[in-house]
């Protein structure tokens, strides 16, 4: 048997910040201990699981699929083809032009070329509708799994909850159960209508409730059944995540409320981590995620000979490593080998689309950002950006082009998916920014609904939230020191029970009137379908406009005359959203001049008193005006301030 290579301890990527938990000890007590040394050479062959998540159509970016295939082939030649599995934890088929223009089919074809064994649906696998989702699953060679994706009409699961794979032979044979867990956020993070019948009744579900118990019970039933079927190890493929995710549905919450899972290969939140949270019996479970867009490849090794589980990388790769004397955890971030056949296959698919995607729409003098400077963390979900301003302005302009004089335009931060770099702006670039082909629409709605929309979108700040609204025609302030009291029963908006965090809302320079009706333009995902659980417009009648990426094209060509210019130069936007962690300080009154004392009448010539210099009444009036002006100026600056 081949020895496992020793892990490395190398510096992290500049864009990656691993949590303190990920840097903690990874030691596991008893039979589920991590190996701190190379696995023993004798005994059963190690079981290697290479994993990806949230690739989002990044077929040749960062590591890319061609390098992934070469890496997997190297592992198979090292440890034996039958001992290596390739799995994906969701959100592979949507996010860029290749996905949008082929409804995800080219991405499934590439995954087939890579040789994936098992996969689970992320929320974005459903973005093309349920019919197309079923087409993609049928097209895939990988087996899809889920223990909680349910047909509510029958109560049956849509996929097998788990599948069993045997490793080794004879007395050394081991069974590994691969189990799928979908995020219940799928109901609102994809298009809700995909899961409803024509009457709007939900006919599919993901074991969602307000406590998390339905999900935990579904997972536990599947784990118990897998153990009863003889599983020696249970590996969960989970599209759950942690940061910015509904707390009861995070991977750590699922681990804390279940038992019997050995490994959680996670996704959804686009984070890099390797952790060992405790399950409900106090036993540590390996939870690992590799970020997004193939910035990393994960690898888990189960060594039956020593009964250990290790998440680490091969000698052949540089690694992001969390290591102590008791354990190691790593994510592969660079790899030199490329599978030529896979690379050529991807180039061929891209060439077929190039005549569409490479059409130049205009130019940009500036960089427009959806991501922070690390090109990894979502900026548009945490604060205003110039790209958020640009997209919202384009929505509003599209309505105006159609003769609809809308007051405000909104776009959810989660719907803005890529930066625009200076230089030529192509059709493919704009599809990457808005890959969903959402239909725009407008609605006459109460100001109260607009206030509730802003409040719900800002409920997680300063943590990111895909429902944060980027705006046009409107400015607002968020006070993050005020606890959010937004109610989201079942993941949908249920009202605000306390003080609003959102305030100082101005529509075209005038305070928002909660009792007045405004014309608002956005997309059907928000207004009609209640995406992100934002259902406050369900009683308003929407009027359809054009597609979201069509709005961007028209805005560049007609309103901006072909060039995105200096008005969008500030990456932080134009001061439409102010995020504060406390109230503005009270303005300091301007110092007042002391009135001159009255003269001594005896000192005046002829015994007469001297006249006063100045008019104290007039001085007091001037001082009051100055203080009021200073207060007004301070308030104006505060509204426009950014963190």
Roles of regions detected by a PLM:
Residues 624-643:
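C-terminal membrane-anchoring or membrane-association module
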Residues 30, 620-621, 638-639:
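Alpha-helical hydrophobic membrane-insertion segments
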Residues 42-48, 52, 57-58, 69, ...:
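Catalytic centers of hydrolytic enzymes
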Residues 1-10, 14, 18-28, 32-34:
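N-terminal secretory signal peptides
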